[in-house]
Amino acid sequence: MTAKLIDGKAIAASLRQQIAKRVAERSQQGLRTPGLAVILVGSDPASQVYVSHKRKDCEEVGFISQAYDLPAETTQVALTNLIDRLNEDAAVDGILLQLPLPAHLDASLLLERIRPDKDVDGFHPYNVGRLAQRIPLLRPCTPKGIIALLESTGVDLYGLDAVVVGASNIVGRPMAMELLLAGCTVTVTHRFTKDLAGHVSRADLVVVAAGKPGLVKGEWIKPGAIVIDVGINRQDDGKLVGDVVYETALPRAGWITPVPGGVGPMTRACLLENTLYAAETLHD
């Protein structure tokens, strides 16, 4: 048996087409164009690449993209003032603060400063709390995108034993809440977990978001399980690999996401979807 690939690139492209169609319809109806403000502080190369992709995505679907490229020495006060200004700008439906930030800045305070109805990354405590209360509003982009990938398989998630490897605020914790909403029985593992292999080997569905290349071995995968690899790690030879040993997981899994081309494109597409939702549902 060889796993079926979950093509995040194709699914994300389809979602972007749907968003672009809706933006065009809004224009024909005389409604304003959704706007996304993207804030980049400093010159981290990976962040610069991510931000350029997000701006290109905005252009593709017809959004207005406001770019704020700030020097690394930007102060907490200056950044807070910018966020306050964007919060009050009626042309801005979403505010994206690219992480990580330089060490002297308090990311938690800045993310909380973004108005919850413009928090299209879904990181604000209000939006995370809504998800925990089972009344999601703006959902964290990566877990939201993963749910869309899982739905594309047609597999019924109700009652599945799911294991999330990694407990970050960005992926692991909100992912566990999304899977609970989807009807799974969820185990969250982390750096202190004993017998990670045992947990993974019992799982019908594994979501790996640890940021450690090759952490999950192919032989751990339960035959027929769904494997979602969120990790994206660059090796010394320049090759991008995930947190799962893909080559040995492929013959055991039922479904698997490739790296790259799996989760990453869906994260970006869901950012656009959240921005459109904010424009239409929260701001119009």
UniProtKB/Swiss-Prot annotation:
Q: Which GO terms describe its biological process?
A: L-histidine biosynthetic process; methionine biosynthetic process; purine nucleotide biosynthetic process; tetrahydrofolate interconversion
Q: Does the keyword Cell inner membrane apply?
A: no
Q: Which UniProt keywords apply?
A: Amino-acid biosynthesis, Histidine biosynthesis, Hydrolase, Methionine biosynthesis, Multifunctional enzyme, NADP, One-carbon metabolism, Oxidoreductase, Purine biosynthesis
GO CC term (a single one): cytosol
Single GO MF annotation: methenyltetrahydrofolate cyclohydrolase activity
Question: Which CDD domains would you find in this protein's record?
Answer: NAD_bind_m-THF_DH_Cyclohyd (cd01080)
> What is the protein's known function?
Catalyzes the oxidation of 5,10-methylenetetrahydrofolate to 5,10-methenyltetrahydrofolate and then the hydrolysis of 5,10-methenyltetrahydrofolate to 10-formyltetrahydrofolate.
HAMAP family for the chain:
THF_DHG_CYH (MF_01576)
This chain's protein is named: Bifunctional protein FolD 1
What organism does the UniProt record list as the source? Pseudomonas syringae pv. tomato (strain ATCC BAA-871 / DC3000)
